[in-house]
Amino acid sequence: MTKESLNSKKIIKKIEEKSKDIKRYNVKKIGLFGSFAKNKQHKKSDIDIIVTFDKETFDNYMDLLFLLEKMFKRKIDLVIEHDLYPELSYVKKETKYVQL
């Protein structure tokens, strides 16, 4: 998957395909937001992912981040849902959640 060919549908599909691996890190909920979710990305855009863990640990966070960066060969901005500032509540509304 080249950087230029990525779009929201391909990202969501790839996350669904790797759901078994993603669940290994105690992920309860995961979604795509930001430029890719709006299909307004450019070739240097990072991928913005929001996540909720059943068991939130540093290892689960870092291992998920490394997995996602390996999957997409692109920088990932991984945000834990409950850490969002109230001013950024719109992020939850624009997020495209993935069925795990």
Language model feature labels by segment:
Residues M1-K29, A37-K43, D54-L100:
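Catalytic core of pol beta-like nucleotidyltransferases
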Residues D48-V51:
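Short beta-strand->loop micro-motif that forms the acidic, two-metal-ion catalytic signature
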Residues L32:
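Conserved histidines in hydrophobic membrane contexts and catalytic metal-binding motifs
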